[in-house]
Amino acid sequence: MRVVFMGTPEFSVPILTAIIGHGYEVVAAYTQPPRPAGRRGLELTRSPVHEKAEQFGIPVFTPKSLKGAEEQDVFASLEADVAIVVAYGLLLPKAILDAPRLGCYNGHASLLPRWRGAAPIQRAIMAGDAETGMMIMKMDEGLDTGPVAMAEKVAITPDMTAGELHDRLSMIGADLMIRALGALERESLALQPQAEEGVTYAAKIDKAEARIDWSKPAKDVHNSIRGLSPFPGAWCEMEINGAVERVKLQRSTLGEGSGAPGTVLDDRLTIACGEGAVRLATLQRSGGKPLPAQEFLRGQRVTKVL
């Protein structure tokens, strides 16, 4: 079976690796173009999928768009049986969707139709969802609206971070995709339309959302911290030894106590919220590495959180 793989971030890599490992012929990998990196943006960084594909000697394509006739002709010339799409980052026009003999299949990190869109892992945790999952669907022209081929649910534990959920769903996605490809080869892959009720959209995370609002209930603050960990990272300003610094908050738990929002309630970094309190467990100063709260506080006095 001739496969075109389309993906960009680290989340996609285990699925690409599994497809290769199970003997499928990956004739090309499509990924986002290299991005400027470094302080001056003079270096170009290739995506994780780009790096992995080159390790296996797979031709890599990095178009900025797939809307043009030239890009669509190149894609069609690959004569793919199927395209596998996992966090690629570009919408696929009809000409691309129709080119593979068996269609295009997407690995999506939510229980559709909940959390269609760009940031399903973060949004599920930030909303306080108790469960999410991984789904394989056949793509159509809508945004994550196609019929579902396979799904697996995953519980979201109370202190689970987006990073932890990301890694788990990525591995589940690899297993589901291999099963889906096998069923597709056997012509036994059954498709079920998505429910019409319960549709929500997982908008891309806005930078402004990363700043913690201590006037919100502790539950919401805690969900924001873990839902934005490790990237982009929730943050706040702290008065440390008399100077105000910006600090990233990577882990937290629900705490006990009350007070004006932002009040430091004890020497274990329990912070009062609009309702209840949150205990900060892992913090990161600018230019530093993430530290457990006890180590972060060594020789430091936090008097105020803004």
From Swiss-Prot:
UniProt-listed SUPFAM superfamilies: FMT C-terminal domain-like, Formyltransferase
Pfam families: Formyl_trans_C, Formyl_trans_N
Catalytic activity: L-methionyl-tRNA(fMet) + (6R)-10-formyltetrahydrofolate = N-formyl-L-methionyl-tRNA(fMet) + (6S)-5,6,7,8-tetrahydrofolate + H(+)
The EC number(s) this enzyme carries: 2.1.2.9
GO cellular component, one term: cytosol
InterPro entries: Fmt, Formyl_trans_C, Formyl_trans_C_sf, Formyl_transf_N, Formyl_transf_N_sf, Formyl_transferase-like_C_sf, GART_AS, Met-tRNA-FMT_C
A molecular function GO annotation: methionyl-tRNA formyltransferase activity
Gene3D superfamilies linked to this entry: Formyl transferase, C-terminal domain (3.10.25.10), Formyl transferase, N-terminal domain (3.40.50.170)
Key words of the record: Protein biosynthesis, Transferase
Residues that coordinate or bind (6S)-5,6,7,8-tetrahydrofolate: 110-113
PANTHER family named in the record: METHIONYL-TRNA FORMYLTRANSFERASE, METHIONYL-TRNA FORMYLTRANSFERASE, MITOCHONDRIAL
Family statement drawn from the similarity comment of this UniProt entry: Belongs to the Fmt family.
Alphabetical list of NCBIfam families matching this protein: fmt (TIGR00460)
Function summary: Attaches a formyl group to the free amino group of methionyl-tRNA(fMet). The formyl group appears to play a dual role in the initiator identity of N-formylmethionyl-tRNA by promoting its recognition by IF2 and preventing the misappropriation of this tRNA by the elongation apparatus.
Name used for this protein in its record: Methionyl-tRNA formyltransferase
Native source organism of the sequence: Brucella canis (strain ATCC 23365 / NCTC 10854 / RM-666)
Gene: fmt
